[in-house]
From Swiss-Prot:
Keywords: Amino-acid biosynthesis, Arginine biosynthesis, Cytoplasm, DNA-binding, Repressor, Transcription, Transcription regulation. It comes from Carboxydothermus hydrogenoformans (strain ATCC BAA-161 / DSM 6008 / Z-2901). InterPro entries: Arg_repress, Arg_repress_C, Arg_repress_C_sf, Arg_repress_DNA-bd, WH-like_DNA-bd_sf, WH_DNA-bd_sf. It comes from the Bacteria. Pathway: Amino-acid biosynthesis; L-arginine biosynthesis [regulation]. Regulates arginine biosynthesis genes. It is found in: Cytoplasm. Belongs to the ArgR family. This is Arginine repressor. One of its GO terms (biological process) is regulation of arginine biosynthetic process. One of its GO terms (cellular component) is cytoplasm. The gene is argR. The keyword Transcription applies. HAMAP family: Arg_repressor.
Amino acid sequence: MKIRRQKKILELVEQKVIRTQEELAEALKEAGFDVTQATVSRDIKELGLVKIPFQKDSYRYALPQKTVSAASIERLKRLFADAVSSYDQSENLIVIKTLPGAAQGVASAIDQVAFPEILGTIAGDDTILIIARDREQVPKILARFDEFLT
């Protein structure tokens, strides 16, 4: 549920002008999520959302810049520990199996960290396909994933 909710928060912040936690909580409730202000506050912190100037004397929530932060890596580690059940590789492809409904959240976290060895990710419901830049990069990627699970 948390992964879906946080994915929805990212969508809302990209698509709408969200100025306050209350507005975000209301938008989440309209989308079918039962949330408290404390939950919204924690999600904002975990996702690294920032407030940026909007119009005159106003601010809105926005996605953070595409820089790798310690928080992004910690979020990915938590998601791996909580949601990833296995992974394997073939040539320059890595397939990750997750709990049902978790693949898109994990793939988004991988994309946010922006590993230079990874060309891209494709996520379904419980499976992620990672395309490495070349097969020589795969051991390095898998070593990082191994660290996340220990």
